[in-house]
Amino acid sequence: MLVDDDPDFVEAVKVIVESGGYDVRVAYDGQEGLEAVAEEKPDLIVLDVMMPVMNGHEACEKLKGDPETSGIPIILLTAVAERVTTSTYSHRDMLESEAEDYMPKPVEPVELLELIKSWLEK
């Protein structure tokens, strides 16, 4: 599942993920994402941090706090921090959200597919 509020970004990432052989469901904010997960639990969620209605950290917190969805791997997408950074901001956000991983925007297609594959194989 992909949750992001930018329709152009969603379409681009959807094409990337589908090229890896994965089915992709889409939601455009955290609340819509929670509702979609309640209908059908995905194997993995790629979740943007900054969105209207409910941001990615709030959605991640709700998903990880629910026994029904706590085991679903979540990859946060952020335009704020680089993946390789050791900044306080990056680590604090990662720990507070309980997400399994994160990736900076703009995403690198090959890296995103590798990250998705690695979490689905665990």
Where do the model's predicted regions map?
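Two-component/phosphorelay signaling modules centered on CheY-like receiver
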Residues: P7-R25
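Helix N-cap/capping motif at the beta->alpha junctions
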Residues: V26-E35, G56
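Short amphipathic alpha-helix used as the core "switch/output" element in two-component signaling
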Residues: E35, H57-S70
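Alpha4 helix (beta4-alpha4-beta5 surface) of REC/receiver domains from two-component response regulators
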Residues: K14, E58, A81-M103, V110, ...
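Active-site beta3 strand of CheY-like receiver
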Residues: E40-V46
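Receiver (REC) domain active-site loop signature in two-component systems and cognate sites
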Residues: M51
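Conserved sequence signature across two-component system core domains
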Residues: V3-D4, A27, I45
